[in-house]
Amino acid sequence: MPVPASQMWTVATYVLKQKLKGRKQYPLVLMLEPLYRCNLACAGCGKIQYPGHILKRELTPEECFRAVDECGVPTVAIPGGEPLMHPRIDEIVRGLVARKKYVYMCTNALLLKQKLHLFTPSKYLTFSVHMDGEKEHHDLSVCKEGGYEIALDAVREAVRRGFRVTTNTTIFEGTDSQSVRAFFSGMMDAGVEGMMLSPGYSYDKAPDQQHFSNRESNQSMFRRILSNRDARWRFNMSPLFLEFLMGKRNLQCTPWGMPAYSIFGWQKPCYLLQDGYADTFQELLDSTDWSKYGYESGNPKCANCMLHSGYEASAVDYTFSFKGIFATVRAMLFSRYRDEEAARQVAAENQRPALVQIDALAPRPTLTGAQVAAPAEMATGIEKAFDYRGDVTVTLGTGEKLEGYIFDRQQKADLAASTLRIMTKPGQKITVRYADVAQLSFTGRDMADGRSWEAWIRKYTERKAAGEKNIELAPEALD
């Protein structure tokens, strides 16, 4: 069984209580981001592209506990950044376990083996190790040669010491089905409890914006991968979510189901999109126009999203309905999903596509210098600054200059009522009215510049040809 019975019971009773209370919008899993620092520089990641002063900041254990208590979820996922780089991560985990929360610590496992002694095996703690496929594919995906072997060694050691271990795999466009299926079997051999997987999502702030599939391609890809399953494979996910990935079931996005909390606050509207932040969970629920998000909304940013952060909670919610219970039981009893056409398609992949392909793509423009110096340009300029992956300098009408990262903006029909929020280098969160901005300059470096998939592959192939080993795209160096 991929999930302990006690955990299933806890989640089931929690969901049923929400339904009995008539709550339509309730959280299921808190995505708790205690820091954005990382020891990898994955081109497809949109969570680490921040200036150095932001990467240095982290949540305290007390702030983490308040967020968990505030939303009341039974399960907490700790992504990052790399959580094991947090100097008090063991204290955070102990506090959550003491609250009897089921904790999934997401990690690339580069530090896991050397830090296992900080933790105690418990049914409440699971290490969710990021593994992006077999060795070559994983190393290229995380932009670090040798990363797979380090992670696999840590997985085996954690299993040996009695920890719960799952894997978390992101599947990108062009992924070879045979390779993924072989990877699943390899993870079962390593002794993991279960596997989680999701299609890639093109984060606005990720260096790589090209290697992501549309919804139809995702469904076709997951149909090939998940049909005709090996009986040994165990997935740490709702079976209805897996059917959704395969195109066998339609689900509506519930972005409030997996809210994200970080140094900026409660992220609007979900873990993936960054349309601003709320100071409290209730403010997140009340101030977000949820009709603007999800596949049915027509929002282009949501058109191809099929990620667990939007749809896993939807699948769990549907499970606790009359039809959902029978659908879940059927999916669990008949989990092989025999599909002759899918089998033929997998067999036809007798020549695996080259993993290293460099596309001729136009680079994302880098913004420098003064962008806004006239009131008529203010709204457009601030929107660019909000999307920018670096520091800006805001000059006020008084002549005062604020240098830092714009992490939120509330644009109203009346610009006089519109505001932005900037986290300055000293760490202050300052609210500024649009009307008070005299000039806006992009003075900081674009933190994703030169870190695209193409830049990484070019570096990898050149250095590989020169005979180098342990090639990597190094993370941002902090002072």
Language-model segments: residues:
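Radical SAM enzyme [4Fe-4S]-AdoMet core and its adjacent flexible, acidic
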Residues: 1, 59, 99-102, 123, ...
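Conserved alpha-helical substructure of the radical SAM core
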Residues: 2-118, 122-123, 328
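Short loop/turn motifs at secondary-structure junctions and domain boundaries
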Residues: 24-25, 248-253, 384-386
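Flexible mid-to-C-terminal extensions adjoining Fe-S/redox cofactors in radical SAM and related proteins
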Residues: 26, 267-348
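Short, intrinsically disordered, charge-biased short linear motifs at domain edges
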Residues: 28-33, 237-241, 284-295, 390-392
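Short cysteine clusters
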Residues: 38, 42-45, 253, 265, ...
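A short acidic/small-residue loop/turn micro-motif
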Residues: 52, 274-277, 409
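Conserved RNA-binding domains used in RNP assembly and mRNA/RNA metabolism
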Residues: 347-479
